[in-house]
Amino acid sequence: MQEVTIYSDGACKGNPGRGGWGAVLVAGASEKEMFGGEPNTTNNRMEMTAVIEALRALKRPCVVRVYTDSQYVQKGISEWLPGWKARGWKTADKKPVKNADLWQELDTLAQPHQISWHWVRGHNGHPGNERADALANRGVESIGR
């Protein structure tokens, strides 16, 4: 299976507010940059959308390393998701899972791949994360004011 590294980030001007997402996909010597935005969203939704759009771009099952500065994404997919699914998309205290639509989409898109999820400290000079951050900000700017 092909190995792919994904660096993802989300940004929001206001929370909720104008948001953007960015992702860098690296497979060997090939790289792809992606970004987009939404007019009324949250930082967590943009963090998730970055990974969703990156996984959507993969055309076949891959071994994937995802690097995100969002503990919400990293812990959500690695730790919390199985419990949410078992409880019918409810949290441990029986409340509806926030962003369940995106969690369900992310769960579906992750299935064909062997994914390892890695948290990196944001704005700490990590080159892949810095590129994803710049793309996410381009996504915000693409929405206008």
Curated annotation (Swiss-Prot):
Q: Where in the cell is it found?
A: Cytoplasm
> Ranges for the RNase H type-1 domain?
1-141
Identify the species of origin. Cupriavidus necator (strain ATCC 17699 / DSM 428 / KCTC 22496 / NCIMB 10442 / H16 / Stanier 337) (Ralstonia eutropha)
Which named protein is this? Ribonuclease H
A Pfam family this chain is assigned to: RNase_H
Q: Which residues bind Mg(2+) 2?
A: 9, 133
Q: Which HAMAP family match?
A: RNase_H
Q: What does this protein do?
A: Endonuclease that specifically degrades the RNA of RNA-DNA hybrids.
Taxonomic lineage is:
Bacteria, Pseudomonadati, Pseudomonadota, Betaproteobacteria, Burkholderiales
Cofactor entry: Mg(2+)
> What are the GO BP annotations of this UniProt entry?
DNA replication, removal of RNA primer
